[in-house]
């Protein structure tokens, strides 16, 4: 591989791997590009900044920045960018050579080392006119047109150092010159190495290791000796030769380097090739599942190298690098800024990434440098403090987000070009764009037309050549500079702020990026978008951000809006990119934010003029969907919320990972940390009469509008022995709220403040003191102090208002929370500590909200039309005369659904009937997926949309869907088929017996008949049972145990998630899909076999009979209950007949009495049966072994034809399938019986279990009512009791992800109730007289939103989605019979009425701890998510299930969606609401299944072996008892079936895998052998 580079006939580089090749001068020729990206060394060489001077005269050169070997075309992975050439050359005679590197150079680099020759011809030895500054860190003195670096007076190479020549000063008479030039000189200079009468011109390039070998025969001092460049104290120097030391002949050098320079004759235009979109093979970053080329790894690599440096990197190097990046970004932005907001996709994908990536890397590296902030020691800078100082770790992690950190420094880069500048970061600034620059030695600081010059020891501040202010320096020699969106603040001994416009808008569609670039740098979001750079802001928003004259933007916005519809900012994004809408939303929010920030900085008069014009554009920017905004990006969400409120949109996205910055207090932290206070309330020593707990503060730095207090350790508690642990300062509406916590007993504090009034209240909770400091009365600067004495008491005030106007915040749990401007909410509790103001007086009181009680009133029926639900939570418009009933009887009786507590207000006496609602919130344990199910990826992808963090949390849901759709559904189908076939077999086999029946046998025969009828009923019930709601209910039962238990589950095609079956989870039952003979055309000889096995000892009949009686009664009730369910669901009847109700009550009474009286006997019987089953399983194992031996004998005598082999294999496959079914069904049985066993133990112990409500708990709940002062008796009708003994049927509306809700309501009648007996905090508050009246307190544990039932007159009311539905009958599901209950407070006669057509119109606002819904004519949408909840859903059968994050599992997420027309399109209700009475008592009674397409008749009568008779010997009498026994096992009523199945299954699998073809059970005793011919006739032996 070789490269040849030529520039006209001037200079040629021959580059190859081993020798020199002569190529004619001409166009650049190369065999292949160097296949390596930039190396670290090349980047280092790029980063030097050269100032060209002609002798001492400053010349203006048409170049903006340079690399050491400056290129006109930079290539990174085939990406070419053209730059302007900086270097001019002269011949040694002084004749101008021209620009060597003008538009014809490019550079490539390699990670490997190249050795190549450099040939220079006669007369081609240019010199460089350069400037060398005299700096404190070393360098040459004065100005030199030609810098000559000789080799120590031409002394020979000495032994004391490395052999060869060294470059540098000072001269040395002995040894090797070791001192090198510091890079504080502008590096990249041409030096002539003196050799005799000739000069060899070398280019000194830092950070490049070169070895120059001068061949023998060439004159020069270092002939035949390598020329080394020593490493200095901390910087390696590299030297590169551009010429020879001989003028009279051509010369050749051999160079070794890891980078090459190429020349070409003609510069080509910058073209972004299509290859740019293709990922780079060497460096690829995977962002959000998409491979993206990482063009900036070289920058990251360089800065990583910088951060590892042992000593401080040189400041000039950093400055030059910043300039280089700055110019690159300007060039690239110009290239891609042809149309407004850049619709060029290639530009977007490639070039525009560079600026943000560079600056992101730059700032992140700054924070990794190991520097510390040191304020000037003794207020004096030390002499060597001339380099950048930045903090290391104090701004990582929780202290500051990356967004705040980068915003802080987005303007700092302006000042990095001044060598003698120290950079400081304040610790807890109230605004994130405050920074401090200490400029002591710099004579001039300039940015655009903003200048600060040192003149006669003073700082003169200029804007556009106009002197604005002259400042006296701080005693420390320090000035501090900050910019607040073009509002400059300069602080010295005296401070000033002024408005200085530093940027201008040039032409439409092209911004003056070159003057505004350094202001654009934006934080990357902290959420999932963090891997996506934000070039949208780099060009489009930067102009909005920077230009202070907002009126200049009106024509631009108008034109942009007219050209780019429908979206205001249609940013030409490739719609296939992941999270593109989120990216666009991000840019729109930030653009609106910048416009708003500029807007609020304008004078009031200009605001009024421009506000009307600006509003539609801001609202257009905010027209994005809330779902498109990444809720985990705290900065974006906070800005969006503020903008929404600021510009009249009353809704907001309120999903936070943490509190947004705008809710933070001015200070919140430990004592001793830094604090910020407004300057006007800064404490002084004036008027201080006595020592205060807040001692005066001195030595602070005044800065802009703030006073910074570096440390404040002098806060103390009234009791001197105590130290305050928390000091919090909040600023709200001209008031400072200070909370001080001292853990001690109660005490009083007295405010001692001079020059104004403050309000200090004694501890509202133990150890917490609240101090109110009105900032408007403290402008004189009083001293803040607290003195022992009498403080104001906290008054308790009763109010009927839900929201208190003229209140600014509330204190709860030692935290102050600002309220919405409309006022603060009041809850039904005594812990509402609210700060309010009246005129100039501030108050701190404990408010308690009271509302009139609600009596029982008659209810009229109003028909409503209902449809399938489309929302989770329903809201209504709140008029002055009505509001939604959101608590059981708001203001009357309050029921805490978590504790059962009951509360009556106002001490009045009532006669009331109500329900105590019992809620069971059942969330199964997290499921571990077996390895065979690990690739269920489609479900996770469907739910998580590529969010990898979501995948872990979504496994529970996916697993539940699999259970729901696969295992249980198929198990029920298989079981139903088996029951039907077993019923047929019993009918078929019984008449064939020829035994003489004894009385015992006849009794057993009758038992079989009864069992047969029961199975028939049960199989019919299963058909009705296969509804979605029933499936969900049974899935819940099966869920109780560890999911799957290691068994591989089948896939079902056509499911809602459209999965493809994985190979490891395809069940064998899919193999039998059609009814075909198992084996056909098999010809074998007729043979009769008689295999005898010993009969295992069966469990005692007495044990089975006791269980059997429970079984039979349970089955009859189940069939009745399911029949009722079927009738109701079909809606063919509206009322149950009296006979049905009586039969139902009779059966319930039977079950109730039996369960209550006999559960101990059942438990004892189960234990006895379990031991018998264990013994039986061991005997069965022996019997199966005997069967195996008998089958071997049969096998040896059978014909070995190919037909028989085929039959054997097919039958073995079938038996394997049968065992698989049995295994999976057994797993379902385990999970079911575990649930029942748990309930039995719960009945026995009286302890509430997570899945079982027991009679004893019911009476415990009744005790709550008995403890009241009045007389309360529970309504204990048989109908009501039945609600507690039937497992509740979980409908679709009650299943949320992995959480099930079971609810019962206990009816209680109370009379003469007195006073407030139990106090609870209701979840919802309604005030019908206030327009902003709906508050949702954030739930702390189980939410009460979907619980409870009310009974008014003869109506039974259950709450669905915050609406009470009431019907005359608990079984009446006709939509026309439902009423929607709303609370009305029309007159003094408080009444409950029903309104058929409420109209919703909600809006939402979120405070940091409370959620409000506001209702007004302007609001039309309300979407609220409380907690860290993702708003993702999955729809199944017209029902929408939320997929929730683990932090809000359950009902911690509240979602309000509207507008919704309530009336003919009423959408708040499920089409099938859960029944008030849920009878779904089901027993799995048999666990045998056969392949699809076959029944028992096929197996017993016609086995499809045409020429073979099979013998199946059975003892009919024992078979009856065995069938009863098997049915009892599978019913789930005994505890040790697991041991039996686990002992039995391995034996079955063992002999099945041997390939035996027959399955025959022969039991000792009376053997009756049945012969079945192929014509089906039966012979008897």
UniProtKB/Swiss-Prot annotation:
The keyword Glycoprotein applies. Residues 1-20 form the signal peptide. This is Spike glycoprotein. Residues 21-1551 are virion surface. The lineage of its organism: Viruses, Riboviria, Orthornavirae, Pisuviricota, Pisoniviricetes. Belongs to the toroviruses spike protein family. Residues 1573-1581 are intravirion. The keyword Cytoplasm does not apply. Homotrimer. GO terms for cellular component: membrane; viral envelope; virion membrane. InterPro entries: S_torovirinae. Its main location: virion.
